[in-house]
Amino acid sequence: MLSPPDIADAITAGLRARAAQDDLEQSVYGFDSLAEVKLHPLVHSALRDAGLGVFPEQRYPSDWINPKRSEGLRCDVVITDDAKGVALRDPRTRGTLFDTLDAVDPEDAYWLEIKTVSQYTTRGPFKGYSKELLSPVADDVKKLWADSLIFHSGLLLILFTETRDVAEHDLLAWFDRCLKRGYPVASPSARGFEISNRIGNGWCAVAVFGVRGV
């Protein structure tokens, strides 16, 4: 079964490679300038390069009973330890003629929400940095926690900060806040590396917080 350290290592390796590519191409802006939604494909590629199955934007299992597939809460990415997996298994079709042989049960997959926050943007210091870090992120934890069909899940928090010290301090502050609110969040599997400072960010922190089974 996949673990937060496995996922953190895979994503860090992929983002390091992207940082090196930005430097080689002498890009005016690095990948830290990208909007969160545009960073998701980088995370997906990193996981695939590690030989993992990647299923972006999957509906939460508790919402599968909704006949309208376009509706319901969605998880940023669902990960399996087999890149050959063709799909996630719908519990409603398990054991029926409509079941998919190579599908992965939702209970066996790793459900990951992604959040990225940058201390600096192309417009300068991000004034909403602290609020963005401490408020919406906790909402993702609650979504994972609330679904009874999710056994393995976590939150990926990618921080772009001026220094390593800032990142480590802010990750600890976020974790401490979750504990004080009673969220079932485990200590993070945290990684980090220097990035070329183009807009004010000199450090990329990658942290995966396990949410269930802690």
Regions found by a protein language model. Name each.
Residues 48-92:
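A short acidic/basic microdomain associated with nuclease active sites
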Residues 77-83, 106-124:
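Conserved catalytic cores of phosphodiester-cleaving nucleases, focusing on short active-site segments
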Residues 88-109:
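A recognition module on extended beta-rich or small alphabeta surfaces enriched in W/G with H and D/E
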Residues 118-183:
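Acidic, metal/cofactor-coordinating or nucleic-acid-engaging core segments within structured domains
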Residues 160-214:
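Non-catalytic C-terminal interaction segments of nucleic acid-processing enzymes
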